Amino acid sequence: MTYKIGVVGDKDSVSPFRLFGFDVQHGTTKTEIRKTIDEMAKNEYGVIYITEQCANLVPETIERYKGQLTPAIILIPSHQGTLGIGLEEIQNSVEKAVGQNIL
């Protein structure tokens, strides 16, 4: 099975991902972002990149997919910079897998 890769965020931050062949969706409101993530999850997206700012608006939606194999939801910084929550999520995952923070 081939999975698709999607990107969700504000237009300025995510439009460049089209160059890599990713499916880019713009969203700025909770409703738009939640609906986009749910649609991507239903439509066989293996990875969804989402800007930290958008993820901050829908933490319950992000949390709902954490326990599932797909989609993997990866937080990325926006064009405005990072909030640090994406790196924190990676550190938590590594610590959970390895038993300590090696980053």
Curated annotation (Swiss-Prot):
Keywords tagged on the record: Ion transport, Sodium, Sodium transport, Transport
Keyword presence, Ion transport: yes
InterPro entries: ATPase_V1-cplx_f_g_su (IPR008218), ATPase_V1-cplx_fsu_bac/arc (IPR022944), ATPase_V1_fsu_sf (IPR036906)
Keyword rRNA processing part of the UniProt annotation: no
Gene Ontology MF terms in the entry: ATP binding; proton-transporting ATP synthase activity, rotational mechanism; proton-transporting ATPase activity, rotational mechanism
GO terms, biological process: proton motive force-driven plasma membrane ATP synthesis; sodium ion transport
NCBIfam families per record: PRK01395.1
Family indicated by similarity: Belongs to the V-ATPase F subunit family.
Function: Involved in ATP-driven sodium extrusion.
HAMAP family: ATP_synth_F_arch
Protein name: V-type sodium ATPase subunit G
